[in-house]
Amino acid sequence: KKPAAQQSAQWVAVDLGLSVKWCNMNVGASAPEDCGGYYSWGETKQKDYYADSTYLYTDKPYNKNIGKNISGTKYDVAHVKMGGDWRMPTDKEFTELRTRCTWKWITQNGMEGFVVTGSTGNSIFLPAAGEYFKGKVLGQRGYGYYWIADIVDGTNTKAQSYIFTNGGLYFGSYNNTNSRFQGLSVRPVCP
């Protein structure tokens, strides 16, 4: 099921006391607890099947180089779909979100995920949207998979992601990367 189109009036830049503001919902979502769209890294449209064979930037045996960091470029789904200063977050910005905010696993309007609260007292909800792999969504309500705008150093086939479950947060290590063709969520940021 494809999510409903999003209206810009619903997007709120939430000040968590960090270097950037975080959007109150995922790209393609209609509410904070809505999973939103699933996107391959560097692609700006959803599809029904997420595999190496359907990835726009496949160039066997590696992927095409579209940049080491796509934040704010034509390959950034947040920037393309939302416009303005909205963009994908970087590894540095996610590290800041992880280390300078409190994280609590909750159920919000029927969706599991983390409420992330900053020093300002403001918070965002990150739904456990799962991932879109091949023709189906896997791990919804148990796992959150979110793209980071950076590729993994030394490889052009994987991009950085942050993954969470109710048992923990997994950021920034090589084991917490995904093949670029996989369909993951994107949570935008802005200055």
Q: What does each model-identified segment do?
A:
Residues 1-191:
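Conserved positions within compact, well-structured domain cores
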